[in-house]
Amino acid sequence: MGHCTSKDQKEGKRLNRRIDEQIKKDQSMSLRIIKLLLLGAGESGKSTILKQMRILHKDGFSQQDLEMIRPVVYSNCIHSMLSILRAMFHLQIEYGEPDRVRDSQLVFATVHANKEELTEELAAAMQRLWHDPGVRECYRRSNEYQIDDSAKYFLDNLPRLSSPNYVPSEQDLLRTRIKTTGITEVLFELKGLTFRVIDVGGQRSERKKWIHCFDNVNAIIFISSLSEYDQTLREDNCTNRMQESLKLFDSICNSPWFADIHFILFLNKKDLFAEKIVRSPLTVCFPEYKGQQNQTECINYIQWKFEQLNRSSQREIYCHHTCATDTNNVQFVLDACLDMIIAKNLKSMGLC
């Protein structure tokens, strides 16, 4: 009887040891998985940053991937022109040349027929429209209506996009816009760690899905578009986009869900901001602003507006100014961010 009890005790101890070892192994494995959330309002550039991560840290995009987005490029290009033509009516802007009315009718007919092929005839009409002084004036006032940021890029490149042998480039892919619905994820290995980067739709209707991604997060990259300080939300055509972004940042930065995680802020689209700030004052969004109307001073002010929302004296906000379509810029910024996250993760594991 005593012999059996002793044997059972030894077996129990061995089992406990194996369980403890497995728990330690699982904990070690979980510490080597870094979960990053990309958060921000709609059209801030989250999906473009995720594409850049795939280019920089995965195998990028294959020739087949590029060819598959050709219809998206055509659709983005046609709908960019459509947005301008509709705005011309609402803003009561006349075409520089009367013949452009016929060209605009072709664009409307194409979209109405659900045929978003960039035919030779349509491309020629769109090129004539894009060079029309009235259309250009309407585009200059693009902050007064809803239009994709990539509009100028695609319309400037119409001759290339409409060529018979056109294959989208990596830059074309970065510029395409498809509304993010649900959750998109990229996994990559770096310096012995697995990074799991998650992008969830930023428009108001999509934010209820964010809660499903909040467990075991190591860092948040919050992305805000600098160039949207004088634009309104696509969802309501009323709320200022920058003010919406600040409100969203406030709620996330100070949420108890994220009290102990690293917080990174990307002030994105600095290239578009540089073009816009020379003609549209920052006081449109911030009437109290008294500084100079130049890129550096205005960006610093916007950064300060975000940073002052952080109510935790223990938390540092790591801020970077980015252009999500510039791979070199994104690589430089991501390298700095990922190195910081890795160093802090190693410290939490007691390895440095």
Curated annotation (Swiss-Prot):
GO terms for molecular function: G protein-coupled receptor binding; G-protein beta/gamma-subunit complex binding; GTP binding; GTPase activity; metal ion binding. Residues 322-327 are annotated as: G5 motif. Keywords: GTP-binding, Lipoprotein, Magnesium, Metal-binding, Myristate, Nucleotide-binding, Palmitate, Transducer. A lipid is attached at G2 (N-myristoyl glycine). InterPro entries: Gprotein_alpha_I, Gprotein_alpha_su, GproteinA_insert, P-loop_NTPase. Residues 195-204 are annotated as: G3 motif. SMART domains: G_alpha (SM00275). GTP binds at residues 40-47, 174-180, 199-203, 268-271, 324. GO terms for cellular component: cytoplasm; cytosol; heterotrimeric G-protein complex; nucleus. Residues 32-352 form the G-alpha domain. Residues 172-180 are annotated as: G2 motif. Residues 35-48 are annotated as: G1 motif. Mg(2+) binds at S47, T180. Pfam families: G-alpha. A lipid is attached at C4 (S-palmitoyl cysteine). Residues 264-271 are annotated as: G4 motif. One of its GO terms (biological process) is adenylate cyclase-modulating G protein-coupled receptor signaling pathway. G proteins are composed of 3 units; alpha, beta and gamma. The alpha chain contains the guanine nucleotide binding site. PANTHER family: GTP-BINDING PROTEIN ALPHA SUBUNIT, GUANINE NUCLEOTIDE-BINDING PROTEIN ALPHA-7 SUBUNIT. Belongs to the G-alpha family. G(i/o/t/z) subfamily. Guanine nucleotide-binding proteins (G proteins) are involved as modulators or transducers in various transmembrane signaling systems. This is Guanine nucleotide-binding protein alpha-7 subunit. It comes from Caenorhabditis elegans.
